[in-house]
Amino acid sequence: MSATASTRRSGRRDDRPRGAARREALLEAVLKVVADVGADAVTHRRVAEVADLPLASTTYWFDSKEQLLTAALELAAARDIARLQEFAAEPPEDFIDPLDLAVAAILEPLDESLQASRGSLLATYLLLLEAARRPSLRGVAKEWTEAYLKLLGRLFKQAGSADPAADAELLLAAADGLLISQLAQGTGGDLGPGLRRLAGALVTG
């Protein structure tokens, strides 16, 4: 039976995603499951339920849980790396100081709604920590980190840093630590001023 005929008989449209969009919807579901209940809870069945898609769609695209987790981290990384590249190509006009830009590059995703950004952050950090015991995730984690360090290193160099690469690593590590602490404690707050002071202190020594 054709899809059109099926739709006519049922009297309703099936607006669920198909093709590549279906794959992306499944990966969005993986990220949601990770944020809600952790990476260990990711299964083909649970992902299909969260995505509101047939179970067969998960096994069509992904043979294993390892593939689900890796592809989900790849999706999150690709999106953020694209954001960083766009940020570097067209930095916000209201930022002139390179250290202000460095802090903004890290914290820009948090300008979205609080709930959405916290869920995204939690899924990201949980998957990055999974790389400690899942080697398949390490390549993505390294590529993602290097994208940040490349941009931050360039900005520290513009600011006159004596060791831009080391300063970039320290600023990124501090930001990660503070963000993880906020997630763990269920708190919020603007990390920008503190990170900016740290960036300035790194440059001035």
Model features per residue range: what roles?
Residues 25, 29-37, 83-86, 90, ...:
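Solvent-exposed, amphipathic alpha-helical segments
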Residues 25, 33-71:
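Helix-turn-helix
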Residues 137-138, 142, 146, 157-205:
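Hydrophobic/aromatic-rich alpha-helical bundle segments in the mid-to-C-terminal region
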Residues 74-80:
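Short, basic, alpha-helical segments at the C-terminal edge of helix-turn-helix-like DNA-binding modules
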Residues 71, 85-118, 168-171:
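Hydrophobic alpha-helical connector segments
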Residues 81-82, 115-125, 132-159, 166-169:
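Amphipathic alpha-helical packing segments from all-alpha helical-bundle domains
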Residues 1-21, 32:
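N-terminal intrinsically disordered/low-complexity leader segments
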